[in-house]
């Protein structure tokens, strides 16, 4: 059996569960990028970002905020997935996600992690607070734009094409 036959053989046996998983991830990407979801998440973060401080200690007030976030955002995503994929089961997807976590785009996995990992949730809020307060990562001083074209001593305004 040559390499091409082995490759097509492997592709033909990808399971139905893999195809379902890929479909859910595709829908998740669409949902997360949708303006309605962005507004929902941003509004929630605007409401609470000042509560979070970059310290080792976690305040007791973080727990109800975390629970409210899970309730609001996870419920929204699950409703959207049910509209797009009838019979969708979040618990089954979460289990499958653990087996496929290396295959999921970082942004999606990070966002899903905020439902189950409190530290990821807190980090999301700390990043948002830093951004709101102008303390975000500024790469502008490290960026240099260089032309790939040969430099000419003639100013661009005088570079007319003549026939």
UniProtKB/Swiss-Prot annotation:
Tissue specificity remark: Ubiquitous with higher expression in brain, especially in hippocampus and cortex. Also expressed in lung, cerebellum, liver, kidney, spleen and heart (at protein level).
One annotated Gene Ontology cellular component of this protein: midbody
One GO biological process term: positive regulation of tyrosine phosphorylation of STAT protein
UniProt KW keywords: Cell projection, Cilium, Cytoplasm, Cytoskeleton, Mitochondrion, Nucleus
Main localisation: cytoplasm
Keyword Nucleus: yes
Localisation per UniProt entry: Cytoplasm; Mitochondrion intermembrane space; Cytoplasm, Cytoskeleton, Microtubule organizing center, Centrosome; Nucleus
Pfam families according to UniProt: ARL2_Bind_BART
Source organism superkingdom: Eukaryota
Entry GO MF terms: transcription coactivator activity
Family that this chain belongs to: Belongs to the ARL2BP family.
Function: Together with ARL2, plays a role in the nuclear translocation, retention and transcriptional activity of STAT3. May play a role as an effector of ARL2.
Subunit: Interacts with GTP bound ARL2 and ARL3; the complex ARL2-ARL2BP as well as ARL2BP alone, binds to SLC25A4/ANT1. Interaction with ARL2 may be required for cilia basal body localization. Interacts with STAT3; interaction is enhanced with ARL2. Found in a complex with ARL2BP, ARL2 and SLC25A6. Found in a complex with ARL2, ARL2BP and SLC25A4. Interacts with STAT2, STAT3 and STAT4.
Protein name (database record): ADP-ribosylation factor-like protein 2-binding protein
Species this chain originates from: Rattus norvegicus (Rat)
Organism lineage string: Eukaryota, Metazoa, Chordata, Craniata, Vertebrata
């Amino acid at each position: 059996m040559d390499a091409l036959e082995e490759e097509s053989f492997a592709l033909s046996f990808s399971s139905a569960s893999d195809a379902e998983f890929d479909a859910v991830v595709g829908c998740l990407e669409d949902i997360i990028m949708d303006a309605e979801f962005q507004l929902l998440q941003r509004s929630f973060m605007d409401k609470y970002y000042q509560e979070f401080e970059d310290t080792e200690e976690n305040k007791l007030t973080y727990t109800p905020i975390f629970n409210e976030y899970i309730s609001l955002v996870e419920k929204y995503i699950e409703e959207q997935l049910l509209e797009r994929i009838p019979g969708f089961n979040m618990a089954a997807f979460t289990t499958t996600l653990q087996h496929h976590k290396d295959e999921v785009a970082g942004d999606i996995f990070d966002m899903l992690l905020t439902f189950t990992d409190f530290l990821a949730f807190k980090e999301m809020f700390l990043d948002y607070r830093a951004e709101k307060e102008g303390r975000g990562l500024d790469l502008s001083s490290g960026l240099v734009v260089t032309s790939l074209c040969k430099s000419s001593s003639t100013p661009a305004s005088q570079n007319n094409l003549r026939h």
